[in-house]
Amino acid sequence: MAGIIKKQILKHLSRFTKNLSPDKINLSTLKGEGELKNLELDEEVLQNMLDLPTWLAISKVFCNKASIRIPWTKLKTQPICLSLDKVIMEMSTCEEPRAPNGPSPIATASGQSEYGFAEKVVEGITVSVNSIVIRIGAKAFNASFELSQLRIYSVNAQWEHGDLRFTRIQDPQRGEVLTFKEINWQMIRIEADATQSSHLEIMCAPVRLITNQSKIRVTLKRRLKDCNVIATKLVLILDDLLWVLTDSQLKAMVQYAKSLSEAIEKSTEQRKSMAPEPTQSSTVTSSAQHVKTPQAANAPDLSDAIVKLFNDFDVKETSHHLVISHLDLHICDDIHAKEKESNRRVSGGAMQLSFTQLTIDYYPYHKAGDSCSHWMYFSDATKTKNGWANELLHEFECNVEMLKQAMKDRNLGSPPKSPTHASPQHTQTEKDSTLKGTPKTPSVLPQPSKAKLMSSSVVVRLADFNIYQVSTAEQCRSSPKSMISCNKKSLYLPQEMSAIYIEFTEYYYPDGKDFPIPSPNLYSQLNALQFTVDERSILWLNQFLLDLKQSLNQFMAVYKLNDSSKSDEHVDIRVDGLMLKFVIPSEVKAGCHQDQPHTVSIQSSEMIATNTRHCPNCRHSDLEALCQDFKECDFFSKTYTRFPKSCDSFNLLHPIFQRHAHEQDTKMHEVYKGNIIPKLNKNTLKTSAATDVWAVYFSQFWIDYEGMKSGKGRPVSFVDAFPLSIWICQPTRYAELQKEFQTCDQVTLNTSQSESSDLAGRMKRKKLLKEYYSTESEPLTNGGQRPSSDTFLRFSSSSSDADVHVLVRVHKHVSMQINHYQYLLLLFIHESLVLLSDTLRRDVEAVIGSPASQTSVCVGILLRSAELALLLHPVNPTSALRSPASESGSPLLPDFLPAENGGFLSSKRKQGGSGIHRIRNATLNHMSDNRSMSVDLSHAPLKDPLLFKSASDTNLQKGTSFLDYLSDKHLGKISEDESSGLSHKSGSGEMTSEGSHTKDVASTDSDSVLNYRDGSTRLSLDDDGNHNPPSNPVTGKGIDAIHSIFRAEDFLPEAASLSENPESSKEEAPPARAPKSQTSLSAKSKERCPPSPAPLSVSYKNMKRSASQVSLDTLSLDSMVLEEQAESDGSDSHVLLGKAMKRNSNTSCQSPAESVNTSANTQTCGEASPEAVSTNSEGTQENRDDLMSVVVFRITGVNGEIDIRGEDTEVCLQVNQVTPSQLGNVSLRHYLGNRPVGSDQKAIIHPKSSPEISLRFESGPGAVVHSLLAEKNGFLQCHIENFTTEFLTSSLLNIQHFLEDETVATVMPMKIQVSNTKINLKDDSPRGSTVSLQPSPVTVHIDRLVVERSDDGSFHIRDSHLFNTGTDFKDGASSDSVVRTRGMCDVRMHSSVTQATQTSPEVPLPSQSANFLDITREQLMEENECLRQRLAQAKMELAEAHSARDELLHQMKRMGL
């Protein structure tokens, strides 16, 4: 009996062992136990059973002892137990792949019989191994794996021990069965050491890894009829891992992996070429299966339950998975490598990498285009990737169809080919290569082929991770800070969302046929990642990686390994980013200011980076529109060589961009042009990475400050969010590729008309469509077709081409704000980054031993409009200049007029804004036709009166003539539109008045008086309130009277000063506002309340008044306008004024809280009556804390280019127009809350033929031609041309304090050229005496001026060499400045005046004669004298008007009003 059983055992075991004889078997038949000793297993059989890769071969397997226990009576429910004591396996690597594995002996155990009882018993065997030692010998290293307490056993679908009958799920209808196995071990020890050799002593650092308990879960799906395995699912689960690696161990690991990479790659290609055809699950049940399962017909419910259970655990395709719950990896420097410490900037450093829930999935046999919903960790990221990959496949299918058609056309036009010329395999695959779409054209030589396009995918998921900053022994004991981390929790993102998702897919045909295949694709998703710049960590990593790369190069040279990397092969790449954050910190100083930020964070909401054109905002049409925007700017033209660019500047708009935008760089385009012979081979449609054009799109991109104590942990905005597009190409690599292409493939470049007729027609239709939709755009091509690609194929890199060309396009208006402490932080960060960059460069040179490769980069930036707000320290209100009248109190006016007047003026502003003469210095010009009076504020940005009003806005000091006129029933409606203008309409006449921007709020000389002249309709006033002799009111059908003049502060803009109408806002010019009296008022949004008109303001000086007079003068123009239709005499007007005083507190369009803040403003200026604002002191105290003096620079038409040539850097910047606005003291909270954010300002403010500001900055060795110091500190050149602006001296002083640095600034050599520039300066500094006169505004007109700064820091100021002598220029400028201090006289010989202060001809150009200069100087002197006379006369009349006004006020007081 025992002999018979031994023979049966030998029959089955002989397939696995060698030299097995019956005497080696000890068997106890009744007990069911047996024992074998010194077993030598068959290597080839084990290779087939384990399905080892062909780059690995088993050379020997030995087992010292094996025992078996068979439960004879319970074979259906209990497994056979096989125990092995110690197994030793020796393996070796193969440089060339060995023969493929044969069929598994388990599958053939029963002679290819059906799945029966014997197969179930064998399948359920439990194997236990005390110790397994695997030794692997490779060319460059030896490795060993030691596993202890290994167990292999069957489990149920929930991975639990149980009855063997529940360890399988059998579906007779499908003809398939699922079995579940689990393999676990107590410990695994991995060790790898370099091959012992005399010349490899430096690479002998052993690599060791010890893991704790782990397990593998295996799910097998077999066919019932032949027991063949259809699909396998293998999951390797590792618990927490801690691995410490020194730099030498990491080098060894990289070297070992590199030595195996070539063999692994060859083996992978072999596996793909011999991959099995994917099999479909059988839906038809065989008769034999029905015989075996007779109960299925009687139990339909049970059958349905089995089918459902089978579907729940079905393995649709083979896959392998690695799951690591937590991995801590520590990389540190070698402690014993003392010879390297002297070369390291950071010695003894260590970095910790912590990964949570790391999963790696591998799907080797996935049918291309099929659904992935059955994958193990299917998510939204997988769904997005599938949609993108399907678009790529669809494009590939279309290209294959066009390629087939091109081959047919070529064959028809050529002599008949031999039958063997056209591959039957290729012709048939016209049907098979397409995964989805329309039916294909029948092939000429059809032949069956079962090959389908397959894909191999690797998916990496990382739920959370932290890469900490480098730490050293010198640092104090503290928890390390994160350098790269995930912010899912702080952003409240779903926990199931992966921090990093990466999926790489390759395509192949199972039979290895030579047919076009798509390019591999890589999809990556980054969610809520934060990168923090740490100087020590970057320096340490840089040296670490450089050392690693250098040792790897040495290793490859020793073993003569080829660099088989496919870096030049194109890979379709897409990277999606969600809530990415880049943080640049600074050193925290003790005792810093509460407004001092500690970090700058650069963030984006959504980001897409791709080299394909199948992503939103990254398509060919988007690039075409962007190229058109750049081409519309002459600055980016190749022929533009004027300053700030030069003849050596790169050609930013490279032809690669234009060819790619019009899809002229594809393989199919070259086929149609005749440059490539159409062939159906593997690489026909593949391209090189050198042809890639990258697109990066940020839907929202913004920059914040963080870490301020005053911010209470909240970020403060620096640059408001805006969309950003970036396009990148590589001309140098493309040129090298074209050279290789021409060398390898000498193909004629002549294009046949027949081959390109379809393409030319398509492009012609595209051009006609573009011309139809954009008639004003510049033609993109010459003639009726696109530029010929033949010429571009012969393209070679020139000096005007950089290695990398970058186009940066900002699509919206950019708004920025910065205060002094934030400015200091930016200076510190700039210095730190420059120092870090220089240190990295020197480290690279030290490790490599030679200078780093010189890379050239060209970056172009296009920005339509921007706004920079300087948040300066608030001006002390008590230091503001006050007139004697203001010392005794000033009357108040309500902040708002009726809202309905705003629409009236807005329409009038649009009608008359462009046709009136532009006046810059408070010159009120009433036209002689008695129908129109206009003062243009075309340079004044928009103002929302709801947000910014000073006390002077409510300060109305009325003269006698004004009160007399109030009694007239012809008081017109007054309103203020977005440009702070005044429109008056009465009868058939209309009046449009736009105030000046140059008046000081507290100025005692800035008074305006209403005047009337007999027989004339012209009224002229200067900045000091001086006027022509008064006359009677104008009569007739024109204007009834002029009843007020706006003071400068009435026209000043608010925070953002952006109009609701972008076109009108673009036509505004710079105002000047005294910040000392500007306070912040709360305001409602424009949607809640329309813009209110500004109150009229007429101020006088040298007139002291009592408190009662001040109270009397506190009038509401809202009331006056509402009752302007009332028929009354002069006495009735006094009654109306008295009623208006009572209505001062309840202004329309204002909430109670806003009213408090509004009226509280007047107290801070020291001009308001205490009685008028006594109830509002609390609101004033609240607003005082966040007051800032704001100066806004509105920038229009920004064109920039950055050229980098190795260490040389050139920055060229061109600004079309700069418009400063001085808002004075405003509430920071209200300013930030009410300014428009991200508004698209497409209109350009007064397009100019030449930009106002051109700037060029150079640094590096190439800048030595300008100055020796320029190599280090840089050299700045700036040209300012045709620039006109206005500034208050307080604003200039405040900006000076803003720019002050805490340290001594480095000397930067520079050269500044100023030409045809006018700056109006208003001195609003406090006077030493209250009776001193306010200085008159001074206009500085600079025709030609050069300012140079040398290396020693000294400045040199000189005039242009175009002037023969400096005397004429000096005299001319002097007289011109005198004249421009008054904006009064109307020079009748020059009717077409275009500037407010221009009362004489412009200073002649240098090309004009000297005689003309003399004549102009004489005219200026005459005008100066005329202005002086007018000024004296106006002062006398002003004093008389003050006296009359004071008398009238006393009369009103006696009347009890």
UniProtKB/Swiss-Prot annotation:
GO terms for molecular function: GARP complex binding; lipid transfer activity; protein homodimerization activity. InterPro entries: BLTP3A/B. Residues 267-295, 409-449, 975-1038, 1056-1099, 1145-1183 are annotated as: Disordered. This is Bridge-like lipid transfer protein family member 3B. The gene is Bltp3b. The modification Phosphoserine is found at S414, S418, S774, S934, S1008. Tube-forming lipid transport protein which mediates the transfer of lipids between membranes at organelle contact sites. Required for retrograde traffic of vesicle clusters in the early endocytic pathway to the Golgi complex. Residues 278-295, 980-995, 1145-1180 have a biased composition (Polar residues). One of its GO terms (biological process) is intermembrane lipid transfer. One of its GO terms (cellular component) is early endosome. It is found in: Cytoplasm, Cytosol; Early endosome. Its main location: cytoplasm. Homodimer (via N-terminus). Associates with the Golgi-associated retrograde protein (GARP) complex. Interacts with GARP complex component VPS52. Interacts (via C-terminal coiled-coil domain) with STX6. Residues 3-94 form the Chorein N-terminal domain. Residues 1410-1455 form a coiled coil. Keywords: Coiled coil, Cytoplasm, Endosome, Phosphoprotein.
